[in-house]
Amino acid sequence: KSGVGRITIPDSLAPGYAALYGPRNFYSFYLVPGQQQEITRLTGQEIKFAGAAKAINIYLNSPFLNNRDPGYEKGEEEFLKAWALMPGRLQSHLDSLPLPADFKKSERKRLYYVACHSLLDYPLRHARLLRLKSYSPGERYYRKVSELLQEDPSAHEFWEYRQFFRNGIQLLGERKKTETGKPLDKLKCELDYICNHIKDEELAGYLVDESMSGYIRYFGSEGMEAFLPLYREKVKDEKQKAAFFRSYEQYTRLEKGRKAPHFSLLDKDGNRKNLSDWLG
């Protein structure tokens, strides 16, 4: 009733980044296990921090960091020139702040991938700002995305790093889908890229699971059989594997042509309806 919640973090964890999700937004948060920290939501979107890492948390939720726009309304060539300045600007802003040196060291690496996400946002944001029904960037844009997909195992702890690879590879796969109109071709393009370019086993397993689990959620299990051996090879986490194959088995029961499970109920007029009476 008071709206106050308490979360206890094990002292054995190292300080690091977290995200606090609300009904309409989320806040970045730097956790320091073993120390007291507070976050208070005021009116509207305004929030207040107290306790350990207060200055860091104010920085992470600052307008400068979260309202970055390299010029999404610009044409491709102009946008790429403007975007090239973003990593340096983010770094300079960080260097100008009186924040702990150990935090700055890790934050510099994370900021690079924050900027990379802004690059991936360009096609969708450009289309929305110019009210275009569809928009596909040119070869130069896709070449830039490919150039930036360089592995750095020391950055795997950062969500922004993992998501940049996931979203970047999906963007390249979406281009293939645009050519053929088939979602399965997009998935194959993503998996081919992972197999041919990703050397880090931990990152490869993460990306294969993201691509195949995402495909099943949106398009079902049809056509997935050929990729199952690859999943077993690349994904090492047994709990992750179990969750994936549980989902896969559930979706195979929804394939076209399969008999519907037994289920019946009374409608508002008292007539019994069976699920097997319906098609679709």
Task: Show the residue positions of the predicted features.
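A non-transmembrane, solvent-exposed segment enriched in polar/low-complexity residues
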Residues: 1-106, 110, 114-122, 126-134
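Alpha-helical repeat scaffolds
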Residues: 127-146, 183-194, 222-232, 261-262
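Long, charge-rich alpha-helical interaction segments
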Residues: 151-218, 223-226, 243
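Extended amphipathic alpha-helical segments with heptad-repeat/coiled-coil character used for oligomerization
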Residues: 108-168
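N-proximal helix/coil linker or "cap" segments that precede and/or mark the start of modular domains
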Residues: 205-208, 212-279
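Solenoid-like repeat scaffolds
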Residues: 96-99, 194-199, 232-237
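Serine-centered coil/turn micro-motif
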Residues: 52-54, 139, 158, 238
